[in-house]
């Protein structure tokens, strides 16, 4: 590798090294490297190397000594690895070529924009397999024009994957919604949740009638899901798909964590019809 690196580097300078020259460079490099390794070993002889084979337990790599000797961490870590093995075994027992087929391509029907909350994983909630849904997740399931991550995923889902259904998935007991409802500074999170606060202000008359905090947060969650689903409708890539005659549906779902059940809020496209004249793009090219 060293020889190849030097040869390619010198070629860019229009110098073709001879074999003896390259060999000398190689030897000089190795000599210098050995000196530095010896120096480092001398300076750190009293420190434990976290990657020492004597310290590292099977199945764990790239962790420091503290975690290597933390039995709770080891059990938790190994649970993930064993869970993966069980998952693979379950799939291949039914269909031996499951993953060979899966790696060829993906053709998901659905694109989920979901909250990052660990209690609402879209695949598990809908009992879908790998390859069935394309997923983007963030705190409080936001769909912002300024969020290149979300907008890129949306564009890819519609234009490349040709999904037929986009679902914004929110949930009860959302920490992001609760944080947005409080008059308390949360640092950088304030910037992310400002949109939720704006939704609360825009609907203050309706929300002001609710006296119970639980009901207030549930209503704000619904309003947020509705707003984000409409933001999906406002996107150019979705409107372009509709202009081309594609049957692309947009929905807003709310998961009740207390029961596990999902409720279709039936809001997105119905409300879009009422406001589309203000946000609809034109995709016809003007004739000059």
Residue positions per predicted region:
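N-terminal short beta-loop-beta anion/metal-coordinating cradle
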Residues: 90-132
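Gly/Ser/Thr-rich loops at beta-strand to alpha-helix junctions
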Residues: 117-119, 171-176
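Short beta-strand segments
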Residues: 113-115, 137, 167-171, 251-256
